[in-house]
């Protein structure tokens, strides 16, 4: 049996956490031969800690052969101690009447503290995925608060947007998602992200050629993917939790185990490619191998795409400037 991997999860008793933990413990994220130790963080309030205890009881009752241990805590330094993987799910949700800038600042406090705790106690090779919104900027804040860790190990989740885009293309073409490759979602995990199927194929054939309808792309496809989260809240009465958890598992599984040459979308610190300023955490197409990701370089960007990329970058720059004073 392999040595256990320590997986820290914040917001562990929340909706996404509840949809996530059982799948991690069953081996869906890291493989059916990889034991895990779950290190679970929740807020230091009685209700959250009680809920966390209940989730841990359920995890025990599943008798997962791969679950080698569990810790439940309200202390980030306990949760992140020697963590190999950290899933930062917990974030302050936007309350009624709350301005976006207030939400940014509230989350900046959380992710500054969590970045500092990771910097202090996590494995030096910890892989960090930020799920809690605004995910790209929260990941940027955590990265900047952890100067001793590798910047490239801080990532934001755009896989949900990627998967949503795949499902829309599947419905349009009447083809299964399994045969689709080379989709990319550029930018911020927000309604400004740009799902781009110019290079994508279905069973080896060009999706752009098959659809051949730029009006559908601009007026139906892009807005549908961008507003899908809001549509789910409207239909379900609460936000997309199971699909977000699924995307987190996809993101980490591909990062750790490799994408076998397939493109996947990850929010990663820019190296200056595609005119995105260095360090901005931005959705790019990547391939993954041996626990590392590599940007897909030199893709042509047409005028239509550039307009969308500029728009999502402008939003990220605005978010970044809104928290700059907190990062020194």
UniProtKB/Swiss-Prot annotation:
Catalytic site: 189 (proton acceptor)
SUPFAM superfamilies named among the record's database cross-references: LDH C-terminal domain-like, NAD(P)-binding Rossmann-fold domains
Identification of the protein by name: Malate dehydrogenase
A Pfam cross-reference name: Ldh_1_C
EC number: 1.1.1.37
Species of provenance: Stenotrophomonas maltophilia (strain R551-3)
GO molecular function: L-malate dehydrogenase (NAD+) activity
Family: Belongs to the LDH/MDH superfamily. MDH type 2 family.
Physiological role: Catalyzes the reversible oxidation of malate to oxaloacetate.
Top-rank EC class of the record's enzyme: oxidoreductase
Lineage per the UniProt record: Bacteria, Pseudomonadati, Pseudomonadota, Gammaproteobacteria, Lysobacterales
């Amino acid at each position: 049996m392999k040595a256990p991997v320590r997986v820290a999860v914040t917001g562990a008793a929340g909706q996404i956490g509840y949809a996530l933990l059982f799948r991690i413990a069953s081996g869906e994220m890291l493989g059916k031969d990889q034991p895990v130790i779950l290190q679970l963080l929740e807020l230091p309030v009685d209700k959250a800690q009680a809920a966390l205890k209940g989730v841990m009881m359920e995890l025990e009752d599943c008798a997962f052969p791969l679950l080698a241990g569990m810790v439940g805590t309200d202390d980030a330094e306990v949760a992140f101690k020697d963590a190999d993987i950290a899933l930062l799910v917990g974030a302050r949700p936007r309350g009624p009447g709350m301005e976006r800038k207030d939400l940014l600042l509230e989350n900046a406090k959380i992710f500054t503290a969590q970045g500092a705790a990771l910097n202090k106690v996590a494995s030096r090779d910890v892989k960090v995925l930020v799920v809690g919104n605004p995910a790209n900027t929260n990941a940027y804040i955590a990265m900047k608060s952890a100067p001793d860790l590798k910047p490239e190990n801080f990532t934001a989740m755009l896989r949900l947007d990627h998967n949503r885009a795949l499902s829309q293309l599947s419905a349009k073409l009447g083809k299964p998602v399994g045969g689709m490759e080379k989709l990319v979602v550029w930018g911020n995990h927000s309604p400004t992200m740009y799902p781009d199927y110019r290079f994508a194929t279905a069973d080896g054939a060009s999706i752009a050629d098959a659809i051949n309808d730029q009006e559908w792309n601009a007026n139906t496809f892009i807005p549908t993917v961008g507003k899908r989260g809001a549509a789910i809240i409207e239909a379900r009465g609460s936000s997309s939790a199971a699909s977000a958890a699924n995307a987190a598992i996809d993101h980490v599984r591909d990062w750790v185990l490799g994408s076998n040459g397939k493109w996947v979308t990850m929010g990663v610190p820019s190296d200056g490619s595609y005119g995105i300023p260095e360090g901005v955490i931005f959705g790019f197409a990547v391939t993954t191998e041996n626990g590392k990701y590599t940007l897909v370089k030199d893709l042509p960007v047409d005028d239509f795409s550039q307009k969308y990329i500029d728009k999502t970058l402008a939003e990220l720059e605005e978010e970044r400037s809104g928290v700059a004073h907190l990062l020194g």
